[in-house]
């Protein structure tokens, strides 16, 4: 996160893109976070935009999450310079380079090029939420929402888990 928020000399960010594309089947943590904490994510995006001195922010969400798109679009009306971008569901849409191309139509050249070389700073939904928590609530990053899923679980869930929680404890929580 720190590296992305500190562009190299001579580089200038033009926009921030929040990656709300869950690139693996069955992952739903970002989706739940958007439904339960949309304003915190939007404020987190504003804070990132301020940190890199840009006026434009995007949140890319796959179009198989119409409830999140509708809610985030409605809430974003109160936040200047922020646009919600519905995206086609295709793998690997959540890859940083693919996301930049889909949202702002710019292609990141081959390495050693990085997103800032095309004016983009990319963070994910969880990071925007964590930045909100850190700045607005003075809460350090000690936990995060994660998806625990699989055919052998009785109750697949999104759990708020402390960093370092053993996998077995999370599995036991879901049966």
Language-model-derived ranges and their functions:
Residues 42, 167-168:
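A generic alpha-helix preference that emphasizes hydrophobic side chains
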């Amino acid at each position: 996160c720190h590296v992305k928020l500190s562009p190299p000399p001579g580089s200038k960010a033009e926009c921030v893109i929040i990656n709300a594309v869950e690139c693996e089947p069955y992952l739903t943590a970002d989706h739940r976070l958007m439904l339960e904490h949309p304003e915190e994510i939007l404020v987190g995006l504003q804070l990132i935009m301020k940190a890199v001195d840009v006026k434009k922010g995007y949140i890319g969400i796959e179009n198989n999450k119409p409830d999140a798109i509708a809610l985030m679009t409605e809430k974003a009306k109160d936040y200047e310079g922020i646009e919600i971008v519905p995206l086609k569901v295709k793998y690997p849409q959540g890859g940083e380079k693919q996301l930049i191309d889909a949202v702002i139509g710019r292609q990141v050249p081959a390495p050693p090029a990085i997103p800032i070389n095309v004016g983009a700073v990319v963070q994910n939904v969880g990071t925007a939420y964590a930045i909100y928590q850190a700045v607005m609530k003075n809460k350090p990053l000690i936990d995060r929402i994660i998806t625990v899923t699989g055919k052998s679980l009785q109750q697949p869930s999104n759990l708020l888990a402390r960093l370092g929680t053993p996998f077995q404890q999370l599995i036991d929580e879901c049966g």
